[in-house]
Amino acid sequence: AKTAGIDFFIFEMRSSNNISQYNQDISFINGLLTSSNANELKFAISYNFANMNLNNNNRIEGRNLVSKFIEDFKLMIPYFEKSNYMSVDGKKLVYITNAFNLFSNDNAALYQQMRAELRSLGFELFIIGDQQEWTPTLRFDFRFVNAVDAVTHKTYALINVNQYDVLNTFHKFTDIAF
């Protein structure tokens, strides 16, 4: 990895809401971190909350999963404590997969509550939220403003070109996103 110029790896960690999936991810990450040269390269976690099954009618508060969301970040602490965990300006980097689907009554308040709990434990976070690849940049902005530190799009290579709106407006979306 160093020879190829890779700065760090991102490892997926699914929510402990599905303990089997969570255990699979933790076993995989821990296995990688036991290799003889694991400390030579940085890593970060990509948090995936999809198994919470959130949607506009089943928000995180209504499903009573706010504490699970916060607990999932606390479960990352053993990794944050590693010297080779990726940081940005001293803050621990966490990438949130499909952050645009974190259905909450108040996303900013949810993130602030989680950040406050981690701060009380001595950890500041730099959170990168993931936005759907074909959406204009200001779509779902209420999920990101005052919540995450940065936003990134999924790769445009994943776009299903058979979708009518994507087929007809792809270039407009691409122009807006860049």
Regions found by a protein language model. Give the residues of each.
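Glycan-processing catalytic domains of CAZymes
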Residues: 2-178
